[in-house]
Amino acid sequence: MARQLYDYWFVQFDFPNEEGKPYKSSVGKMVYNPILKREIPEGWEMKKLGELCYFSNGINYDKTIEGDTNYKIVNVRNISSSSMLIDSEDLDSICLPSKQAKNYLIEKNAILIARSGVPGATRIVEDVLDCIYCGFIIKCLPHNQLLRLYLTFLLKQFEGTTLTQTGGSILKNVSQETLKSICIVVPSEEILKTFDTQIQTIIDTMNLHINQIASLTKQRDELLPLLMNGQVNFDLSDD
């Protein structure tokens, strides 16, 4: 549903106009952009990701160095095993010097992009404190928090592909420079606010379901050995 909404609003440009009608289908004004080589809604801008976001590579650490603080860490496998939201229950823990690790903490509005595995695979992490990311991942931190979910869906279009500066499909080697050079359409602030509100509701529901599944899985794993050993019985007889 979230993906469909993104496509409808930002690929087909049928976001709601002032009357609540689909913009492009209702003959909303489109303007040709020579760099993108296509029409975009009037009033929308074209910018490079480097103008909109701060990028940084993840941590490379020495396992032989003694740490003083425990952190959750997002590895490439966490990205590969998820589709959009990273399962916080599946994250590894690592003890590192806080002086080093504090530079790699994942902020609330950050986007994570894999450099290996599935190149360009894009994910987000919700509500995880003291969480860092590994060196095979790039963090994208939008200057405007309203861009986070929009950019997440935009970047997910290019997973496992290579990328031209105008967003064409020709990221085998994902780097900060590659990402910074991508030219994208920037919607109006009003449309971004509406999209962010609607998608965040869906994300919150997805995150709730992930946590519920993790809780049920934990209960199953705890009960199964007890059932197999006969330490727990279920009375299925009728009263």
State each model region's role.
Residues 81-83, 120-122, 234:
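Flexible loop/turn segments at secondary-structure boundaries
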Residues 1-4, 27-59, 185, 189-193, ...:
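Non-catalytic DNA-recognition/assembly elements of restriction-modification systems
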Residues 148, 157, 197, 201-204:
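Hydrophobic/basic alpha-helical segments
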Residues 75-76, 92-159, 165-168, 175:
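A short beta-sheet element
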Residues 20-25, 62-69, 88-89, 166-168:
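Short coil/turn segments at secondary-structure boundaries
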Residues 32-35, 50-64, 77-108, 127:
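Sequence-specific dsDNA recognition surfaces
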Residues 2, 6-13, 19-27:
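Glycine-rich, mobile lid/loop segments that gate access to catalytic sites or pores
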